[in-house]
From Swiss-Prot:
GO terms for biological process: arginine biosynthetic process via ornithine; L-arginine biosynthetic process. The lineage of its organism: Bacteria, Pseudomonadati, Pseudomonadota, Gammaproteobacteria, Enterobacterales. Keywords: Amino-acid biosynthesis, Arginine biosynthesis, Cytoplasm, Lyase. This is Argininosuccinate lyase. Gene3D superfamilies: Fumarase/aspartase (C-terminal domain), Fumarase/aspartase (Central domain), Fumarase/aspartase (N-terminal domain). Its EC number is 4.3.2.1. One of its GO terms (molecular function) is argininosuccinate lyase activity.
């Protein structure tokens, strides 16, 4: 059933209908469309369009339809309706007859779809927040279990300074906490209702839009009808949140892919999140992580595509805006799936402590400690930096770590170096000295874990 047609003398070409119709994807807004219609029916009573008995009949029929949709949402796709609004109205008319045709009084699909999408976005944000916090919790638990797992920290993918696996986990907790904050901020701007703005100029009926917004769970109604029906900032904002969040998950995946590789060997992934090769029987591939990394690109593309769609649109509504949903649905589905999958990867991961520690002792990751030692002896840092660089060259020439160089060799580069240098060069000393807030010292890591547990109510 089309919601228009009186103006036209010819039927739409079937090819245009297939091109124009959106039911194949906006069917996902069915529940929100029904909920919005119930609220609108109540508003129509307040302005005398519906009697209380008529509204009751409509609400009862809509609630029955809501249960039918929840039981089998795929039934919607069997229809040739243009969009979800047409489908809901058609089903309502099937149930209550001519009365169903009164429901759309004073309402446009422009404010209707804007309301539906905002309601869907609000619900989806809550799902994303839950999944985000579940992953943060998994990272904190993994950190707590691996506070003593010393491993190399990297810059430029070169061993730089020793850290712990716990400290690495907590770095991603921080990223996810920022993602959580962005979603919460987005939710605040989502929480205004456009229903009652009509096609673009507002409704001709004196409906209390603030009351209507409250019935739908919004904190307030929007202030300008032109903006309200054409606003898709929330779509851009959620896509941006997703793009940033997926960058974080992609980096998480890349790190673990490397840590799991034969070249690093710091962790072993569970069989539950890996797959094999059809040819090479020895392979155990990190497919879950590679797919997280790969799916990141689709989400970035959705954001870019939506920005390009909106950038040249005049006020108010244009059919271009129908393109807001597929990319948004796909991007947020991906983000949600990847949050769940990342948590599953952590469930069963094994950290290979001996291999991690062995790698941390290689690559001259304690060179900065020697420079700090020299500074403590009164050597200016820039000079100390140069001295240590020369010492590292000598250690490389001898094929030894810095702490294995004889004192006589170290003193060739600076006479201030004494026997007290060797304890300073130990891995434990490297960690212990990073005791400022946010550092890798055991005390700071333990405190960060405790703080995260309080914030996450673990």
């Amino acid at each position: 059933m089309a919601l228009w047609g009186g103006r036209f003398t010819q039927a739409a070409d079937q090819r245009f209908k297939q091109f124009n119709d959106s039911l194949r994807f906006d069917y996902r807004l069915a529940e929100q469309d029904i909920v919005g219609s119930v609220a609108w029916s109540k508003a129509l009573v307040t302005v005398g369009v519906l009697t209380a008995d008529e509204q009751r009949q409509l609400e009862e029929a809509l609630n029955v339809l809501l249960e039918e949709v929840r039981a089998n949402p795929q039934q919607i796709l069997q229809s040739d309706a243009e969009d979800i609004h047409s489908w809901v109205e058609g089903k309502l008319i099937d149930k209550v007859g001519q009365l169903g045709k009164k429901l759309h009084t004073g309402r446009s699909r422009n404010d209707q779809v804007a309301t539906d999408l905002k309601l869907w976005c609000k619900e989806t944000v809550m799902e994303l927040l839950t999944a985000n916090r579940q992953l943060q919790s998994a990272l904190v638990e993994t950190a707590q279990a691996n506070q003593d797992a010393v491993m190399p920290g990297y810059t430029h993918l070169q061993r730089a300074q020793p850290v712990t696996f716990a400290h690495w986990c907590l770095a991603y907790v921080e990223m996810l906490a920022r993602d959580e904050s962005r979603l919460q901020d987005t939710l605040k701007r989502l929480d205004v209702s456009p229903l009652g703005c009509g096609a673009l100029a507002g409704t001709a009926y004196e409906i209390d839009r603030e009351q209507l917004a409250g019935w739908l769970g919004f904190t307030s109604a929007t202030r300008n009808s032109l903006d309200s029906v054409s606003d898709r900032d929330h779509v851009l904002e959620l896509l941006s949140d997703a793009a940033i969040g997926m960058v974080h998950l992609s980096r998480f995946a890349e790190d673990l892919i490397f840590f799991n590789s034969g070249e690093a060997g710091f962790v072993e992934l569970s069989d539950r999140v890996t797959s094999g090769s059809s040819l090479m029987p020895q392979k155990k591939n990190p497919d879950a992580l590679e797919l997280i990394r790969g799916k990141c690109g689709r989400v970035q593309g959705a954001l870019t595509g939506m920005m390009m769609t909106l950038k040249g649109l005049p006020l108010a509504y244009n059919k271009d805006m129908q393109e807001d949903k597929e990319g948004l649905f796909d991007a947020l589905d991906i983000w949600l799936d990847c949050l769940h999958m990342a948590a599953l990867v952590l469930d069963g991961i094994q950290v290979k402590r001996p291999r991690c520690q062995d790698a941390a002792q290689q690559g001259y990751a304690n060179a900065t400690e020697l420079a700090d030692y020299l500074v403590a002896k009164g050597v200016p840092f820039r000079e100390a930096h140069h001295i240590v660089g020369e010492a590292v060259v000598e250690a490389i020439r001898q094929g030894k770590p810095l702490e294995a160089l004889p004192l006589a060799d170290l003193q060739k580069f600076s006479r201030v170096i004494g026997d007290d240098v060797y304890p300073i060069l130990s891995l434990q000393s490297c960690l212990d000295k990073r005791a400022a807030k946010g550092g890798v010292s055991p005390q700071q890591v333990a405190q960060a874990i405790d703080d995260a547990k309080v914030r996450l109510a673990l």
